[in-house]
């Protein structure tokens, strides 16, 4: 390796390390970003830092929305803040485009809320503020290189406060393509699994634990059903792999010396086939054969979602998480790409390498350009 090349690669390795290391602490310090300032996309790290520093747990995304609104308006975009119902009443989807027409060939979109788990919640470094920062930097870099028309019509940016499904009426993709940003480890998604939510409930008869005979233990009934459910063989497919099941919530009982009268659980199935009804039938059979007293309900389902990946030069991947892609209707191509890994998103280990963020800017630029020149 030539000395210059060596120095450059050492520098870039230390940039990557810097953010990853800093991000392990609960707040990213200013010096993390200073140590890691890249030359290629001047706005990238500053923007990412600003986005990550503004909290935006789902249902209260007001501040980060206003920041983006100002940021984009200052750069000459026409910005429309679409109010979103729910949450603390101060949340907006930010829709931005160049020129006077909001009808564009490409819509580039991601979400700005950071998901709240039951115990841990990520700061959104990866999911999905990495995508938002890289998408904006990509559009800005294309503008600088005259890859998109300054007078508009090519690209619109949409940052959703919570869910794209709220946008279907106002921004359905009439253009050629919508590019979605979620963590895909820098790969182009060929599709993602579907979802089936399962609610289970058992009713019993309360009583004193010392005298079990007249009572009926709802927890015992439920647990027998759950144990059988976990052994059920769910349909798989070549493209999407195994259908998997997670029992994520279990509730019931009041005290260890009282026979519980109620117990319930909920599970989420990640569907690898669109045979939703078959999967429901398998689950019902497994639960009811082992424990007839358990009631099952299936409040929500969505089959696996195939996604376009007809752009050369990308590794591709099937993702096991859901997105709102099926909710954005329209006759357009759909691409899904983003920096970072879902394995660290939503946790206090959430972090992103600067090199991945920079690669994402390049890749979003490529995707946008390829669609525009078709
Ligand atoms: C797009 O522009 C049209 C015409 O000006 C307008 O009716 C519509 O509300 C706009 N939509 C958004 C999301 O800005
Ligand atoms: C899918 O399930 C089969 C059978 O249970 C298992 O052997 C295999 O390792 C699973 N594949 C993946 C990718 O988890
Ligand atoms: C699945 O079951 C529902 C409810 O029973 C029914 O309305 C629907 O048509 C079924 N879908 C298929 C593909 O069989």
Segments predicted by a language model, with ranges:
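Cleavable N-terminal signal peptides of Sec/SRP-targeted secreted and luminal proteins
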Residues: 2-18
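Acidic/His- and Gly-rich active-site-bordering loop/insert found
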Residues: 2-3, 19-125, 143-152, 336
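Metal-dependent amide/peptide-bond hydrolase catalytic core
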Residues: 19-32, 38-39, 183, 190, ...
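Short beta-strand micro-motifs in enzyme catalytic cores
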Residues: 90-94, 196-198, 263
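Acidic-glycine-rich active-site phosphate/pyrophosphate-binding loop
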Residues: 103, 113-117, 175, 190-201
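Structural motif
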Residues: 104-106, 156, 176-179, 244, ...
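Short beta-strand segments
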Residues: 109-111, 158-160, 179-182, 201-203, ...
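Acidic/histidine-rich catalytic neighborhood of metal-dependent amide-processing enzymes
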Residues: 124, 128-197, 237-238
